[in-house]
Amino acid sequence: MGSISRYLLKKAADGLKDEQRLKIEMSDSKSVPECFHFNRERRMPIAEINGEDGFFMFPSQQSLENFENTKKYSNELSPDAIGIPLFQIINCTLPFGKRGHSNTVVGNVPYYKIFKFILRTADEPPPYTVAKIVCSNNGLILYKVPLYDIYKNVSQANVTYSFVGTTSTEPNLLAMAHREGHRDLDTKVNNLNLRWHVTYSPVVTNDHYKLILLADYEVNRLDEDVIRAAKNKMSIDQKDQKVQRFVAAHYTREFETSLFRWVAQEGHLILGEYSTDQGSFGLNNIPPLTEELGCQSLLIHYIEYMKRQRKKIAKEARRQNKRNVANTTNMNMNLM
């Protein structure tokens, strides 16, 4: 077998392992909370659109591809709502757009905002008074509405992100928290203790987060003090038990596409859901849990993006300093 054939076989095998590693378990076991009794897997791409601020999340790969193959927002709207993004997240602290260098919050200004796209018929009233019309045709209207303001609070031990609903119908129950200097993000959804866990690698930066279900005795950074104290008092024997981690979702950047395209895939949320409409790939019939985890993964994506930007800026500064030192040295030598 030639080297090219071996290489192709290895790539195919690696791809199969990646697919298996990112699979979502379909289970109706009593040991798994009922909200995680899934009957299908959904893949929601996160994309950067040329000329637009922030990042967009699409309800399915099919929806993104439909959007990419048509002109932005000018395609014919259809009742299946395929080809329309579900969410957009923007950074409120960057004065020069998404690629600005600042990340300083002023007063009570939110760090991030999440918008939701909603499709209605022309006969239906707007979903909210703050709804902005994006486009309309075929008796349908596409609205863009503010969904969450995300505030960042830095305490002595934790960094907490609070999702504040911008309409009266959105509950203010979403929050994520991590230890200062660490990447794992704790959250609570449906009163369950969950953690977006990323495995540390000293060699390369790992961008694969798993949403895992915590055991009853494991401390969540969003726990109240009395609950945290009770968990810490649990027996060591119980804590030493090996826990079978149930994974409800994955966030990954493994399938990103070229940045030189006008729509560049930069990440994916892969999650399980229970759906009564197995053929829905657009905005229709998306479960609330899917939307909540979608908003959380968008925040993770932007946090990781800002870290890469800061590293890039620091690297460029070091290069510029080296060039300045070299130029100064050359000038001094020429003067001698």
From Swiss-Prot:
Alphabetic keyword roster: Cytoplasm
Subcellular location, principal: cytoplasm
Protein name: Protein DIA1
GO biological processes: invasive growth in response to glucose limitation; pseudohyphal growth
Role this protein plays: Involved in regulation of invasive growth.
Note: Present with 736 molecules/cell in log phase SD medium.
Disulfide bond residue pairs: none
Coiled-coil portions: none
Superkingdom of source: Eukaryota
Cell location: Cytoplasm
GO cellular component terms, semicolon-separated: cytoplasm
